[in-house]
Swiss-Prot record:
One of its GO terms (molecular function) is dethiobiotin synthase activity. Pathway: Cofactor biosynthesis; biotin biosynthesis; biotin from 7,8-diaminononanoate: step 1/2. GO terms for cellular component: cytosol. Its main location: cytoplasm. It is found in: Cytoplasm. PANTHER family: ATP-DEPENDENT DETHIOBIOTIN SYNTHETASE BIOD 2, DETHIOBIOTIN SYNTHETASE. It comes from the Bacteria. This is ATP-dependent dethiobiotin synthetase BioD.
Length: 212
């Protein structure tokens, strides 16, 4: 079985879709977002297809496409859809697969199940994406604690934003977690500029050698 990686974040809107696009492209692999909530604007899957450089068949269709940009449990209820979380099984592919979650770890999929519950069941190593802005220390360390409490293995933490040496250092030291690198805000954001920024900030082998 090839490498499978779950990308999650400390919050919503922190850049994990752009990071996932860069990672999937660098791995020349596959991408899958199981649940998309919100269809009016460009979806995360469409963003990854635009930025990753992957062929269309490498960007897998979502299991659930929900109209409302909200927590999956609410978006599903508004659409009259039941999320059958037991059927959300991570595909096995012949190349690396990047699986992107929605929001943070404790985002509800249903009234009884969170994304963290799903990750604990999958038993696939996680990359935690974290901001570098004010507030990231608390959010990041809480997320690391939550993952560890559920026995979810971490490949490490990927910072997103402008350099913040002290915050990045204290998170990795206190959290005892590997710093994978940092992806700055990229402007203009294109396939080429993203690929270059990711190559400058990360070593792809770190994503292939297993949890620290």
């Amino acid at each position: 079985m090839s490498t499978r990686i779950v990308v999650t974040g400390t919050d919503t809107g922190i850049g994990k879709t752009v990071f996932s696009a860069a990672l999937a492209g660098a791995l020349d692999g596959f991408y899958w977002k199981p649940i998309q909530a919100g269809l009016d604007d460009e979806t995360d899957t469409q963003t990854v297809l635009r930025l990753s450089g992957l062929a269309a068949e490498r960007v897998l269709p979502e299991a659930y496409r929900l109209r409302t940009p909200a927590s999956p449990h609410l978006a599903a209820e508004l659409d009259g859809v039941t999320i059958e979380h037991q059927a959300l099984l991570v595909p096995e592919k012949d190349r690396p697969l990047v699986v992107e979650g929605a929001g943070g770890l404790l985002v509800p999929l249903t009234r009884t199940i969170t994304y963290l519950d799903l990750m604990a069941r999958w038993r696939i190593p996680v990359v935690l994406c974290a901001r570098t802005a004010l507030g990231t220390i608390n959010h990041s360390l809480l997320s690391v604690e939550a993952l560890r409490a559920r026995g979810v293995a971490m490949l490490g933490i990927a910072f997103i934003g402008e350099e913040n040496v002290e915050s990045e250092r204290i998170i990795t030291e206190m959290g005892k977690v590997r710093r994978l690198g940092r992806l700055p805000h990229v402007a203009p954001l294109t396939r080429d500029t993203l690929r270059e920024a990711f190559a400058d900030g990360f070593a792809i082998d770190d994503f292939l050698k297993g949890p620290a």
